[in-house]
């Protein structure tokens, strides 16, 4: 039996239409905390200072995570190389990179705590074009490259030692002209 061309009823359709559908944001559990992230407004900048002391003192704030909490820990992740920090440590590399995270008893408390975190930046040169970013003289975004041990096919990647290009992977299999003639 084929359902192509037939109307399909959605089991959740009526609840969505009535506004009765439950979403993750609608769920409240005992002891649940709300987490909000403070994000960079700079495309590329050195982080000179992060002061979360006022946010930590706000009633209802349970925890504030900043770069200071990551010292001495494995703070990087990534599928091929671990080059993505859990949150910004020395600098930010894009608008929206997480600088700090706040866990609080209520959403509005977490949002208020974000406003109390002070961050001082030193803007750095930024590149807004893919081809410009690939040039050798472009600012390098990921200077540290810790090779990941968990990527199953990483042996096929030729990791680059410098620059913004992580890997070059050359595919050369078969005869293109023959492939087109046989298609």
Feature names for model-found ranges:
Residues 1-176, 183:
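Flexible, low-hydrophobicity surface segments
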